[in-house]
């Protein structure tokens, strides 16, 4: 399953003390494919370095870009589907070009995507994504 993780969800997932740490562990175990772009990686790096630590940022980014279950895309078209926070469109564009199942985000700016019929981009909250991963593990 291909997904795009928004930055806040990645930050929640990388903390071993967070209830969503299993999302990061499942990524490391190859249970889903993370779809990224250079822009997304840059944001991950900047936000983790600023809010947590530069060393952790370097480790997380290195881990992501060296995994086999990562799809790196370079969108050639910007869809501009999110007007409230244009910066979030990098996640939308990545999801579209990577044919991701959904974007994992708790950000309300993504809610507008539920009303846009084309191109269809599904968005789920991180708690639902964790349940999806747990359900997938149970059916294996």
Located regions from the model:
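A secondary-structure boundary/capping signal
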Residues: 6-7, 36-37, 106, 125-126
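Acidic, PIN/NYN-like endoribonuclease modules and their adjacent C-terminal/linker elements
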Residues: 108-140
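PIN/NYN-family metal-dependent endoribonuclease catalytic core
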Residues: 5, 15-17, 21-49
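Hydrophobic/aromatic ligand-binding patch that stacks against planar heteroaromatic rings
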Residues: 26, 64, 94, 115
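Alpha-helix capping/helix-boundary segments
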Residues: 9-10, 40, 109-110
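Active-site neighborhoods of divalent-metal-dependent phosphate/nucleic-acid chemistry enzymes
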Residues: 69-103, 108, 112
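Extreme N-terminal starter segment of soluble prokaryotic enzymes
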Residues: 1-2
């Amino acid at each position: 399953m291909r997904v795009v993780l928004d930055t806040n969800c990645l930050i929640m997932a990388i903390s071993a003390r967070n209830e969503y740490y299993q999302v990061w562990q499942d990524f490391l175990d190859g249970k889903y494919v993370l779809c990224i772009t250079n822009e997304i990686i840059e944001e991950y790096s900047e936000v983790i370095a600023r809010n947590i630590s530069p060393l952790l940022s370097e480790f997380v980014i290195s881990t992501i870009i060296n995994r086999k279950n990562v799809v790196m895309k370079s969108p050639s078209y910007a869809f501009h589907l999110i007007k409230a926070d244009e910066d979030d469109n990098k996640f939308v564009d990545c999801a579209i070009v990577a044919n991701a199942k959904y974007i994992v985000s708790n950000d309300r700016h993504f809610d507008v995507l539920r009303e846009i019929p084309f191109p269809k981009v599904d968005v789920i909250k991180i708690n639902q994504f964790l349940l999806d991963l747990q359900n997938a593990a149970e059916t294996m």
